[in-house]
């Protein structure tokens, strides 16, 4: 599979907060070839703790996301360590001084990158897992005339209060490490990140995932092994300020929280015209089906298709388990053929 990865410097960008960020960079990878009419573009924004390479597991000639048919752009959201982030920015915006990012900022930067680099003004599909699904929702609400189809799996249009509380708890585990030093650390706050990961381990999978010892399918014999061998390495691979930067974006996510909709969530949902499939997992502990039901009730041209899985939120993790990945692939295949 031919993959082209690059980092685009978009120059000076004013963020939703009013902060002007110089030399904003967007990292992405492309798969396939853009056709002459530029009508075969698919955008896949990344998720929390994810990078563009993670989507490679669900892209291929035998998949709905087929590079021989579509031009697929997997784009790194800000704060993930590849696009502009606390860890890779120069003073005065380095580390803890990096500005707060919203999904409005992510999608505006992605729009500029697509136009500047590829001349793309419309998308056949915007799709993503978790925070990638949140960005897909933002795209469809903010640019309804540019998005033909949208899939959000294990995601939401707005972060619910219970989800926000979960994230506050995880954050507290990291902040409690004195090494973190208000984000000015000179050595990795390893104890804090490990605590962060262990709290997360109780929320990413469902209760039934542990009850049925499904972590053994991932190579971890016990629940303790799963925490230490799956969750801890995943988060230790990230800079601590990057983790908190992405978390802020997640906590404040809301498609209506902008000048366009001025807090009117119903109006923002009503504005989405893209053919849409919302795919929460039946056992997701932080993006529950009920939240997606509320969103779907405010939209037209939408199907609510819960993932029938006991893997919880990680049912949507790209390529993590074959059954759920096939369910997600089938939804993409159906929507792209419509």
Predicted segments — roles?
Residues 293-296, 301-338:
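Catalytic active-site module of serine/aspartate enzymes centered on a nucleophile-bearing elbow/loop
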Residues 38-49:
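Short beta-strand element of the alpha/beta-hydrolase
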Residues 146, 152-233:
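Alpha/beta-hydrolase-fold enzymes
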Residues 272, 278-280:
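Short beta-strand/loop motif that positions the catalytic acidic residue
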Residues 229, 245-268:
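Active-site nucleophile elbow and catalytic-triad environment of alpha/beta-hydrolase enzymes
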Residues 258-265, 274, 285-298:
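Short alpha-helix in the alpha/beta-hydrolase fold that links the catalytic acid
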Residues 21-33:
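A short loop-to-beta-strand scaffold at the N-terminal edge of the catalytic core in hydrolase folds
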Residues 49-134, 138-141, 145-158, 162-167, ...:
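Gly/Pro-rich cap/lid or specificity-loop segments adjacent to the active site
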